[in-house]
């Protein structure tokens, strides 16, 4: 069965693993998921991510995210929300990029220059599709 929204599936797996205090979570790999994982790592929301080659008998690559917690198991991700969906795409101009929780969170934007955070897109003056909010 095909997946309608692979990005929403990734964010749901991340949210569920975070709520259950899991150390890692795995999902099918794609370039855009790896790009989102790279942004989450650079912004300090996850500890690491790794692309695993398919094992014998498996079909495709997998992406493994290593979650990050504080000293007393405080979650580094308070919330994740998918914004642009297959049924309702959400775009923002460079002048109208969203601020998540007054700048405490990030918005992940798909632009012509690749995946960027809202701050990076504002600095480069590019708009694009608002994929998700993370705070």
From Swiss-Prot:
GO MF entry, a single one: structural constituent of ribosome
Keyword Transcription: no
Cysteine pairings via disulfide bonds: none
Assigned GO CC terms: ribonucleoprotein complex; ribosome
Biological process according to GO: translation
Function text: One of the primary rRNA binding proteins, it binds directly to 16S rRNA central domain where it helps coordinate assembly of the platform of the 30S subunit.
Family, similarity comment: Belongs to the universal ribosomal protein uS8 family.
HAMAP family linked to this entry: Ribosomal_uS8_B (MF_01302_B)
Protein name: Small ribosomal subunit protein uS8
Annotated organism of origin: Cutibacterium acnes (strain DSM 16379 / KPA171202) (Propionibacterium acnes)
